[in-house]
A protein has these predicted regions:
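Hydrophobic positions on the alpha1 helix immediately C-terminal to the Walker A/P-loop
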Residues: 476
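P-loop NTPase motor domains
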Residues: 54-70, 289-296, 381-382, 392-451, ...
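Extended, folded cores of ATP/NTP-driven motor/assembly subunits in large transport
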Residues: 1-427
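Hydrophobic anchor at the beta1->P-loop junction of P-loop NTPases
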Residues: 465
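A short helix-turn-beta junction within AAA+ P-loop NTPase domains corresponding to the substrate/partner-engaging
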Residues: 509-512, 703-717
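Post-Walker A helix-loop "phosphate-sensing" segment adjacent to the P-loop in P-loop NTPases
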Residues: 482-492, 507
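The conserved Walker
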Residues: 457, 469
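Conserved lysine of the Walker
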Residues: 473
C-alpha cells in the first residue's frame, strides 16, 4: 500500500513510478496494472457539438449507457478530456508568390490568437477477484527480467501453461467485450491504441502539460512501464498544488452536485480559453454491493436527519421532535429512489470526477482553475482545490488510478453518462488524404478551436456555396482559390463582377472579360482537327443555328455533318465559322448568318483562336448578363467547357469555380454540363465549386438537385436572416438537409464573417476574418482594379505588395498611372 501522506511533506520529490498503477504490457494493446488489472486505452473522435443538437445527444447518451451497462462489477471505465493549445498550421511551400503572401498574412492572424484542441480518451479496466490471481505472481514477479524471459524460465513447470492459458482467456474475453462496445458506438469514433501510440497516450494523460509525442514512445527493452514512462518527479512543496516536470498542477474536486444533470452538462469546458484536463471514472458495483451501500447510506441520513441535541431531547421527554433537517431527508428520498432504479436493473457504481489546471507557475494554474470553477458553479456544482489529498487526487485521474480518489461517490450509470465528455468540437482533417498534402486552410471558430477545412471528403471535393448578396461568397471563393494554389493546380474561375481580376493579375494568370462590343478572338472551328472536335462542332453549330427558334431535323443534321467533313479537309486558315456560310444549304446558312456577319460576329467568327488557358484563368461573365446577350451564353459556355475538359488530367489537380452560378444555371446547357461534371470529374482529379444566392435555382431543377445532393460532398451556407420564413425553413431543412440547430445558425450568423460548413461527419460554423492586406487583393471597384493594373505595368515579381500598400493609403490614381506610363514608355 502506498503511503501518500509522506508526499505532502515539504521538498519531497519522489519518483512518479511509485505512484503510477501500471506495470507492463500484457499485449500490444493491453497494459497490465500493479493490482493485476488489465487496461485498454482508446482515442475518441467524439460527437460534434455543432453537428448534433440536444435531442441527438440525449439519444446517444442512452446508446452509450446501453453499451456500457453490460460490463459488470469487474470493470472500471474512465474518460479523459485534455484541452491543449494548438499551434498546428497546414504549411506548404507555395509556387505562387501571391498565394504565399496571402497565406503568410493569414497565418500571422490565425496564430496570433489562442486556439485549442480537445483530446478525448477512454480507458477500460478489468480486474478479476484477487483470489483468482495469485498464480500470476509466479510469472509477473518483479526481478528485473523481461516477462518473456520469466515465462521461458518456467518452461519445465506446470504453472507456465496454466498462467498463459488463463491470461489468453482473460484477454480474449476482454477484447470481445470491447469490440462489441466499439461496434455499437460508431459515431464516437473509437480507436484502440497499441504499442508506441498506447504508451504515448498514457504518458500524455499522466503529464498533460507536455505535448502528445507524435510517432509514439518506443517500446521498452524491459517490462516495467512505471519506471520507463517516468522521467520526472513529484514536488509537493506547495500548499494546494504539485509540480511535475516543469509544470505546476492544481486539482479541483467536486464536493457537491446539482440536483439535476443532463447529457453534455459540462460542455462549457469545450470552449474555455485555457488548457485543462477533465477526468471521470466509474467502477461498476454488483447489485448486492450497491444495495448494501444504499441501505447504509439511507440509514445514515435517516439517523442524522435529527441533531444529537434533538435526539437527546426526545429521549428525555419521550416526545418526538418535528425539527428535521430537510437536506438530510432529501438525501433519504434520493437514496430510496436510487434503490428503485437498482431494482429496475440500472447499474450503479463508484464514480469520481476531477479537473486539473496547470501552468509554468502556480499563479497561471490558479487562473485556469478559477475559470474552470466559474463554469462549474454556473451549472450548480460546488468545487474545492485539493491540498492534503492533492497527490492522490492527481494520480487517481490516470488510467488505473481510480482507487486513489479521495472523493468518490455512488451514482447510477445513467447519471454518470451525463458527465462523460463524449461531445466535442471536431477540428476536421489536418491532412488532405486524397491530394496527399496538408489541409487547404485553417478556419477560426467561436470555440477557439481551429477547423481544418478541405473541399474533399474522401475522393469527392465538389462544393456548393449558398448565400445572399453581401454575405461573403466572393470573399471566400477568392480566398479558397488562393489557398488551393498550394497544390499547384489549374484554376478556372467564372467571375461575376470583377472580384477575381486583381488576384488573377497577381497570379500572372489570364483574365478574359467578355463584352458584347469587344471581339473575343475565339474560334471554336479551330478544334475541328482535334480528337472529338467534329462531334463537338456538330453540337456547337446546332446550338448556333437553333438559337433563333429553328429546330433542325434529321436531314439538316446530315447536311451539317457533311459540311463539317468538308471544312475539315480545307487548309487550316479556312477552319473558321465563315467557311460554313458557302457550304451549308441556304436555309441553314441563313440561320448561321447573325453569328458570321451579323449582331454576334465578334464572338466566334475569328481567323485565329487566342484563348491560351493559363494555370489561373478567370472568365468575367457579368457584361453578358443582359437580355440582349441571352443567346450568346449557351454556345460560349459550350466552347469554354470544351476547352476546359480537354485540359483536364488526373495528374494535375484542377478546380473550377463559378461565382453567382445562378447566371449559368438558367441555361439548360450549363445545367446539363454541371450534372455531368459532378458525376465524372472526380476521376480527373477535378473539383467544381459553385456559388449561388438563391437555393431555389437548384431546388427547382430536379435533376440538378439530385446531382447536388448525391455528388456534392461539401455545402457551405452563408448567413441569411431573410430565410426566417416557413417556406425558406422548409427549403433549408427538408430539401438541403439542415437540422433545426444548423438552420438557427444560418439565420443568426454574421454576414461576411460566418460560414456554416456541412460535410459528412461534421457541421462547423467557421469564421473567416481577413485583414486589409488580403482583402485589397479581392476588390472589384474601379479604383482598385485600375490601381492594380497601373502598378503591375512597372514590373517586378512582387508588384502586388506595392499595390496593397498603395491601396491601404488610397493613393490617388493619377500619381500611380502617370508613373506607370513612364515605365511603359
Amino acid at each position: 500500500m502506498i503511503d501518500l501522506k509522506k508526499y505532502t511533506k515539504a521538498n519531497l520529490k519522489p519518483s512518479v513510478s511509485e505512484l503510477l498503477p501500471i506495470f507492463s504490457l500484457a499485449n500490444p494493446d493491453v497494459i497490465r496494472l500493479k493490482d493485476e488489472g488489465l487496461c485498454a486505452l482508446y482515442k475518441v473522435r467524439g460527437i460534434d457539438s455543432e453537428t448534433f443538437g440536444s435531442d441527438f445527444i440525449s439519444y446517444y447518451a442512452d446508446r452509450l449507457e446501453d453499451a456500457l451497462k453490460g460490463l459488470g462489477e469487474n470493470w472500471t471505465v474512465s474518460f479523459f478530456l485534455i484541452r491543449k493549445r494548438n499551434y498546428y498550421y497546414p504549411d506548404i511551400e507555395f509556387k505562387s508568390s501571391v498565394s504565399k503572401y496571402i497565406d503568410e498574412k493569414y497565418k500571422e492572424r490565425v496564430l496570433r490568437n489562442k486556439n485549442y484542441v480537445n483530446n478525448i480518451y477512454i480507458s477500460f479496466i478489468y480486474r478479476e477477484n484477487r483470489s483468482k490471481l495469485k498464480i500470476f505472481k509466479k510469472v509477473f514477479e518483479r526481478d528485473g527480467k523481461k516477462i518473456t524471459e520469466k515465462v521461458k524460465s518456467l518452461s519445465e513447470k506446470k504453472t507456465k501453461e496454466d498462467v498463459i492459458k488463463e491470461l489468453k482467456e482473460r484477454l480474449r474475453l476482454i477484447n470481445k467485450e470491447l469490440e462489441g462496445i466499439a461496434e455499437s458506438l460508431p459515431k464516437l469514433g473509437l480507436e484502440r491504441l497499441k504499442d508506441e501510440e498506447l504508451l504515448a497516450a498514457y504518458y500524455f494523460v499522466v503529464n498533460p502539460a507536455q505535448d502528445l509525442r507524435q510517432g509514439g514512445i518506443r517500446l521498452p527493452d524491459y517490462a516495467f512501464l512505471d519506471e520507463y514512462l517516468t522521467d520526472f518527479t513529484v514536488d509537493a512543496d506547495y500548499e494546494e498544488a504539485i509540480k511535475l516536470d516543469s509544470s505546476v498542477y492544481k486539482v479541483l474536486s467536486v464536493k457537491d452536485y446539482p440536483q439535476e444533470t443532463y447529457p453534455g452538462v459540462l460542455d462549457g469546458l469545450l470552449s474555455l480559453d485555457k488548457e485543462l484536463k477533465f477526468s471521470c471514472s466509474f467502477s461498476f458495483l454488483s447489485k448486492e454491493k450497491a444495495k448494501s451501500l444504499m441501505k447504509k447510506r439511507r440509514r445514515h441520513y435517516f439517523v442524522t436527519r435529527k441533531s444529537l441535541l434533538h435526539q437527546a431531547s426526545e429521549t428525555a421527554t419521550g416526545e418526538e421532535t418535528k425539527l428535521i433537517d430537510p437536506t438530510k431527508m432529501s438525501y433519504v428520498y434520493d437514496t430510496e429512489e436510487a434503490m428503485q432504479e437498482l431494482d429496475l436493473v440500472r447499474p450503479f457504481g463508484i464514480a469520481s470526477v476531477n479537473f486539473i489546471a496547470w501552468g509554468k507557475a502556480e499563479k497561471e494554474a490558479e487562473e485556469t482553475s478559477a475559470k474552470i470553477t466559474g463554469v462549474l458553479k454556473d451549472r450548480g456544482y460546488q468545487v474545492l482545490t485539493e491540498s492534503l489529498n492533492k497527490i492522490s487526487a492527481y494520480f487517481s485521474a490516470v488510467p488505473g488510478g481510480d482507487k486513489l480518489n479521495p472523493r468518490s461517490f455512488m451514482v447510477s450509470l445513467g447519471n454518470f453518462v451525463d458527465y462523460i465528455p463524449f461531445r466535442t468540437i471536431l477540428i476536421g482533417d489536418k491532412f488532405n488524404f486524397y491530394l496527399k498534402a496538408p489541409a487547404l486552410c485553417a478556419l477560426e471558430t467561436k470555440h477557439k478551436t481551429l477547423f481544418y477545412f478541405n473541399f474533399h471528403v474522401k475522393d469527392v471535393g465538389h462544393t456548393v456555396i449558398f448565400g445572399p448578396t453581401g454575405a461573403g461568397k466572393s470573399v471566400i471563393l477568392n480566398f479558397l482559390a488562393a489557398q488551393y494554389m498550394k497544390y499547384d493546380p489549374q484554376v478556372y474561375f467564372f467571375d461575376f463582377g470583377y472580384t477575381a481580376e486583381i488576384l488573377s493579375l497577381a497570379q500572372n494568370g489570364l483574365h478574359v472579360d467578355f463584352k458584347p462590343e469587344k471581339r473575343t478572338y475565339l474560334n471554336p472551328v479551330s478544334l475541328i482537327s482535334k480528337k472529338g472536335g467534329k462531334s463537338f462542332l456538330r453540337d456547337f453549330l446546332q446550338v448556333l443555328i437553333e438559337s433563333f427558334g429553328y429546330s433542325m431535323d434529321d436531314e439538316d443534321l446530315k447536311q451539317l455533318w457533311k459540311a463539317i467533313e468538308l471544312v475539315a479537309s480545307l487548309p487550316k486558315n479556312k477552319h473558321v465559322l465563315e467557311s460554313f456560310s458557302s457550304i451549308l444549304p441556304q436555309n441553314l446558312s441563313d440561320k448561321l448568318r447573325p453569328w458570321v456577319t451579323g449582331e454576334y460576329k465578334n464572338y466566334f467568327n475569328n481567323p485565329v483562336d487566342m484563348l491560351n488557358l493559363s494555370k489561373y484563368t478567370v472568365f468575367e461573365m457579368k457584361n453578358l448578363s443582359g437580355a440582349n446577350n441571352s443567346k450568346v451564353i449557351p454556345p460560349l459556355l459550350m466552347y469554354l467547357f470544351e476547352r476546359i475538359d480537354s485540359s483536364l488530367s488526373s495528374l494535375i489537380p484542377t478546380i473550377i469555380i463559378l461565382d453567382e452560378s445562378w447566371f449559368e444555371l438558367q441555361h439548360p446547357i450549363f445545367a446539363g454540363k454541371m450534372q455531368e461534371w459532378l458525376q465524372t470529374l472526380r476521376k480527373l482529379n477535378t473539383i467544381v465549386v459553385f456559388a449561388t444566392q438563391d437555393l431555389m435555382h437548384v431546388a427547382e431543377n430536379q435533376r440538378m438537385l439530385s446531382s447536388v445532393l448525391t455528388n456534392v460532398s461539401t455545402k457551405i451556407f452563408l448567413p441569411n436572416y431573410k430565410a426566417d420564413t416557413t417556406d425558406m425553413k422548409n427549403l433549408y431543412i427538408n430539401t438541403f438537409g439542415l437540422t433545426e440547430n444548423e438552420f438557427e445558425m444560418v439565420i443568426t450568423g454574421t454576414p461576411a464573417r460566418d460560414y456554416l460548413i456541412k460535410q459528412e461527419h461534421v457541421t462547423r460554423m467557421a469564421q473567416l476574418s481577413l485583414d486589409e492586406n488580403i482583402t485589397a487583393l479581392i476588390q472589384s471597384d474601379e479604383y482598385a482594379r485600375r490601381l492594380a493594373k497601373a502598378i503591375k505595368l512597372r514590373g517586378g515579381d512582387d508588384w502586388f505588395k506595392d499595390y496593397v500598400e498603395h491601396f491601404k493609403k488610397r493613393t490617388p490614381l493619377k500619381e500611380v498611372e502617370d508613373l506607370s506610363e513612364y515605365f511603359v514608355n
